Amino acid sequence: MKHEMMNIKPRCITIFFLLFALLLGNYVVQASRPRSIENTVSLLPQVHLLNSRRRHMIGSTAPTCTYNECRGCRYKCRAEQVPVEGNDPINSAYHYRCVCHR
């Protein structure tokens, strides 16, 4: 009986330290990137304003403009969404066109 108790103690201690190490590791990982709710909430209106100023890109990435498409531009040239039908831009399909910017 006494021999069994001596066997159980090291096992319990080992399990205890293993769980403690896992919990401590989890705490350290989560604490390395602190996120407060107040900062996240205060950034939401700013993100919404930036997104509402321009239309969202169709697809995941905008195409890159070639040298020939930007040949006449003096400054910056980038791909933008342009409605196919200019009369009804909301219900129209969009395609990309390279536009010169100043």
UniProtKB/Swiss-Prot annotation:
Disulfide bonds join 65-98, 70-77, 73-100. One of its GO terms (biological process) is regulation of stomatal complex development. GO terms for cellular component: apoplast. Keywords: Apoplast, Developmental protein, Disulfide bond, Secreted, Signal. One of its GO terms (molecular function) is receptor serine/threonine kinase binding. It is found in: Secreted, Extracellular space, Apoplast; Secreted. Residues 1-31 form the signal peptide. Disruption phenotype: Reduced stomatal densities in various organs. The keyword Disulfide bond applies. The keyword Secreted applies. InterPro entries: Stomagen (IPR031753), Stomagen_C (IPR044858), Stomagen_C_sf (IPR038572). Changing residue 85 to A: No effect on conformation, but decreased activity. Expressed in immature organs, including leaves, stems and flower buds, but not in roots, shoot apical meristem and petals. Detected in the mesophyll tissues but not in the epidermal tissues where stomata develop. It holds the Pfam family Stomagen. Interacts with ERECTA and TMM. Belongs to the plant cysteine rich small secretory peptide family. Epidermal patterning factor subfamily. The loop (82-95) connecting the two anti-parallel beta-strands (76-81 and 96-101) confers the function to the peptide. This is EPIDERMAL PATTERNING FACTOR-like protein 9. The lineage of its organism: Eukaryota, Viridiplantae, Streptophyta, Embryophyta, Tracheophyta. The gene is EPFL9.
